[in-house]
């Protein structure tokens, strides 16, 4: 899941930069230009892990990464085999243990938590209340994001929402959309608690 979503994210990034949809300034990641995320959720924690995985992938070559690793108190582990094949990485048990420790520590940093709260938490509320959503998860995540951000008073008009979808056959797709002014007429009538009874 994580590897396929990252590949799809890289393809989205390449297209977004090539077409001028997003223009990166010095020290920026494409994740800085996505206001909210709604992703495929086999379960809620997978969304949290997916965000951590994407942020690590995007931030590790930026100046902010040294501040992240300083807060964690360790450098990001590196696999022994420089080829970086999935087989060599999975076979490197010392790396896998260290990487899991690093991921957990990263998810406790202020950098991750600030981004998570700002860009993803609201899209996971429905999953927390309903449970596993599988096929409908990305769209239920969007509904959750819209409803809970609306209740917080967030104006989503003009905001970019990044979508990450994963399907059978180990394939993934990443795309984005911009919230239009008419969303308010739809979202003001949403009541997830009432709808799920």
Residue ranges and their predicted role:
Residues 1-197:
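Terminal domain-initiation and capping elements
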